[in-house]
UniProtKB/Swiss-Prot annotation:
This is Large ribosomal subunit protein bL20. The lineage of its organism: Bacteria, Bacillati, Actinomycetota, Actinomycetes, Mycobacteriales. PANTHER family: 39S RIBOSOMAL PROTEIN L20. GO terms for biological process: ribosomal large subunit assembly; translation. Belongs to the bacterial ribosomal protein bL20 family. Pfam families: Ribosomal_L20.
Amino acid sequence: MARVKRSVNAKKKRREILKSAKGYRGQRSRLYRKAKEQWLHSMTYSYRDRRARKSEFRKLWIQRINAAARMNGITYNRLIQGLRLAEIEVDRKILADLAVNDFATFSAICEAAKAALPEDVNAPKAA
């Protein structure tokens, strides 16, 4: 069997790592070992933060919806409960967009949710 010399493949692999490490500071963009270590960490951070971004956006949408809902005299959790009871299927991303860009439509949705809610159990009873 013929001997395989790794020179070409090794240089190609190193070149790819250094190419992807472009923009890192100092030795991390110039020295292969440092660049590879930083590149591995970068890929780990990217993977983790792609997942974290989803929860961060959901939190942002909920804050926006809550602020706009309170301007309409209802809290976030009561709004979501009312939407479920009224069988209005609008996700939080769309609700947040409506709250920011089309407040009149959001107000109409809030009114529909309020109408679907049962009487408040915490309200004083008229005896």
